């Protein structure tokens, strides 16, 4: 999911 991308911060 693209939303999970913010968790990479």
From Swiss-Prot:
Q: Keywords assigned by UniProt?
A: Amidation, Neuropeptide, Secreted
Name the source's superkingdom: Eukaryota
Task: Spell out which residues are annotated as carrying Leucine amide.
Answer: 9
The record's GO CC annotations read: extracellular region
Q: Which GO terms describe its biological process?
A: neuropeptide signaling pathway
Cellular compartment(s): Secreted
Can you tell me which family this protein belongs to? Belongs to the FARP (FMRF amide related peptide) family.
Function of the protein: FMRFamides and FMRFamide-like peptides are neuropeptides.
Q: What is this protein called?
A: Extended FMRFamide-3
Q: Which organism is it from?
A: Lobatophasma redelinghuysense (Gladiator)
